[in-house]
């Protein structure tokens, strides 16, 4: 299975450091996790919702990763999430879910619904899990946002 990331070149390393420093929808502060998406287009959308249109970086890269089919992928089903889980203001329950998954070390990959497009999926990758090393990362490729995204 192939997953994608879009990020600034300086943050291309799949170490979960950005998520550890700032937290995210699915992780609390001090919990390293690598965020990826099921498609490059979803990765772009997930990136765009966090960028200031006036400060869009020019050093973006896309990075593909291949998750071996033999690797366990756990899933959080949309129907099991609390009401309002997509709201940007109420992420604590999701952060606890994701952080507990990281701590439990039950798998290196967790499939979660996208808050932007709930029928599509993002993937949390646990860099502390022993199977994380089996994920194969392609080299970062320069990526430019179409200027229409920033209008």
Region spans (language model):
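Short, solvent-exposed amphipathic alpha-helical segments in soluble enzyme
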Residues: 21-23, 48-53, 126-128
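Active-site and NAD+-binding cores of ADP-ribose-processing enzymes
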Residues: 2-15, 56-151
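NAD-dependent ADP-ribosyltransferases
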Residues: 5-7, 14-27, 34
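Short, well-structured hydrophobic secondary-structure segments
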Residues: 28-76
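Small-side-chain structural scaffolding
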Residues: 18, 36-37, 43, 98, ...
């Amino acid at each position: 299975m192939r997953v994608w990331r879009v990020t600034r070149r300086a943050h291309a390393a799949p170490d979960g450091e950005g998520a550890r420093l700032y937290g995210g929808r699915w992780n609390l502060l001090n919990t390293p996790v690598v965020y990826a998406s099921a498609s490059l287009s979803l990765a772009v959308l997930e990136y765009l919702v966090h960028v200031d249109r006036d400060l869009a970086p020019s050093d973006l890269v896309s990075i593909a990763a291949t998750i071996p089919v033999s690797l366990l992928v756990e899933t959080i089903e949309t129907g099991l999430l609390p009401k309002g889980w997509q709201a940007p203001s109420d992420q604590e329950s999701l952060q606890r879910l994701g952080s507990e998954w990281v701590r439990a070390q039950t798998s290196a990959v967790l499939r979660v619904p996208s808050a932007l497009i709930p029928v599509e999926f993002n993937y949390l990758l646990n860099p502390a899990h022993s199977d994380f090393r089996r994920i194969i990362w392609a080299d970062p490729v320069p990526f430019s946002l179409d200027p229409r995204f920033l209008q």
